[in-house]
């Protein structure tokens, strides 16, 4: 058997593994979704301090913030803290306007220009925590919106034995433009299922930084979120620290929504290259498993080798089944794909492959106008005020 034919069969094996990996991740996601449908807590609700670290105007910011003032939660049992570097932040008047519409919900505005660490988000969280009154803390990004029952469901996790932290998977919505649509297909179709699989199968403390509910007891046990101000992946490292401290870390598929409206291709590429480099620094050899996420490159490699016509037909059927399964799973969990999205699935796969390759090398990234180099465990080694 020639080397060319062997390569063809090897590529087909890779395609088969890619399909199997997607099936496993989809099952893990659906299982997590079923577990998240428990009854929200009624009576004896714990106090929650909701912390919003804001820097600039995120997509859909006003509507996102509004959703937190419409939570179905007892008056006086939660508060919302907005944290800024200064009153000059363009998000401040928006947050103030929303808060003024809801005087019954306690709101606190924190301004602290100090940057003791390279992670600006952690700096904002740290400043706000000094003013938080309750024993449960919800870290929530500016582009996140929630349903009214969200907080009741979230706090119900803490009725279980020794839970110290629960984070929430998210669904990206509202994408406009090709680049944003491709990004949304990755976020909803690859990232969420992969995160659920790692959490369920490998018992990794996969923490999604968009929405993290953590007990103050767990935070105190790991010396607070400020201990991670020099790292870029503060969410994953917080989850790992909380678990090592003896607390349970849970991943909820009671999805929050994120606004991913319209971004340039350059912005999408920079974001996902940064994330890929972070995952490589954290995952080590496990990063290689991400090569199974996109099915199309394996199909094209099989097609290029063309060891047998029957194998080509089988490969094409597997690829079609993979995409149809993603469309079906999306409908089940509430992220229905339209025709334009479905036609972009192959482009999404090629983009994911390119991002994987880009994440293999380099350390220099840009985040919110700052250039930095990522060190071991995403340690921020250098920091400047100019984007890379």
Residue ranges of predicted features:
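N-terminal membrane-anchoring/stem segments of glycan-assembly enzymes
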Residues: 1-44, 181-185, 193, 197, ...
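Membrane-embedded multi-pass helical conduit in multi-pass membrane proteins
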Residues: 9, 16, 20, 27-31, ...
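Cell-envelope/extracellular polymer assembly enzymes that use nucleotide-activated donors
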Residues: 46-49, 79, 237
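A conserved hydrophobic helix/loop-capping motif in glycosyltransferases and polysaccharide synthases
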Residues: 48-57, 64, 71, 83-85
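Acidic donor-binding segment of Leloir-type glycosyltransferases
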Residues: 66-116
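Acidic donor-binding/catalytic loop of UDP-sugar-dependent glycosyltransferases
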Residues: 90, 141-157
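Long helical/loop segments within the catalytic core of UDP-sugar-dependent glycosyltransferases
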Residues: 99-130, 134, 153-222, 226, ...
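Catalytic donor-sugar/metal-binding loop of nucleotide-sugar-dependent glycosyltransferases
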Residues: 230, 236-258
